[in-house]
Amino acid sequence: MTAPTPEFRNKKQRKQQVKLRTPGKAIAKYVRMSPRKVRLVVDVIRGKSVSDAEAILRFLPKSASEPVAKVLNSAKHNALHNDEMLEDRLVITAAYVDAGPTLKRLIPRARGSANILKKRTSHITIIVGERNDTRGGKR
């Protein structure tokens, strides 16, 4: 016998019931940096503990480390406040950078022509979760 499926009156009720919330998630949108350059920083901290990642970002000589550190701090505080996780067990479960809209600007060139300068933007997403300690378990 299967469990009866709940019936919802409207789309909003269904979203509230079925909503799968990602714990400790933070997104920074429309950051005025190239996604290619921000990915260099995000690749360094992916999979590390939050305290290690904060220390790495503090001393990393890249301008993209500042907005990534802000997003990481926001994700950490979301996990601590909203989901009541323990700070010393937090680890970066997912971190990725998507390309945002590109601003196109014209640069005048010789003989009345022009080149297009693409000012790229990024969307930075960091998801933080608790570490699963599988060490010391039964064999």
From Swiss-Prot:
- Sorted alphabetically, which keywords does the UniProt record give? Ribonucleoprotein, Ribosomal protein, RNA-binding, rRNA-binding
Q: What domain of life is recorded for the organism?
A: Bacteria
The residue range of the signal peptide is none
Record bears the keyword Magnesium: no
One Pfam family assigned to this protein is: Ribosomal_L22
Q: Which intervals of the chain are annotated as region Disordered?
A: 1-21
Single Gene Ontology BP annotation: translation
Q: Report the GO terms under cellular component.
A: cytosolic large ribosomal subunit
UniProt xrefs under InterPro entries: Ribosomal_uL22, Ribosomal_uL22_bac/chlpt-type, Ribosomal_uL22_bac/org-type, Ribosomal_uL22_CS, Ribosomal_uL22_sf
- Identify a single GO molecular function assigned to this protein: structural constituent of ribosome
PANTHER family, per this entry?
Answer: CHLOROPLAST 50S RIBOSOMAL PROTEIN L22-RELATED, LARGE RIBOSOMAL SUBUNIT PROTEIN UL22M
As for family, the record states: Belongs to the universal ribosomal protein uL22 family.
The protein's job, in short, is:
This protein binds specifically to 23S rRNA; its binding is stimulated by other ribosomal proteins, e.g. L4, L17, and L20. It is important during the early stages of 50S assembly. It makes multiple contacts with different domains of the 23S rRNA in the assembled 50S subunit and ribosome.
Quaternary state and interactors: Part of the 50S ribosomal subunit.
**What name does this protein carry?**
Large ribosomal subunit protein uL22
Q: Which organism is it from?
A: Deinococcus deserti (strain DSM 17065 / CIP 109153 / LMG 22923 / VCD115)
Write the lineage as a comma-separated list: Bacteria, Thermotogati, Deinococcota, Deinococci, Deinococcales
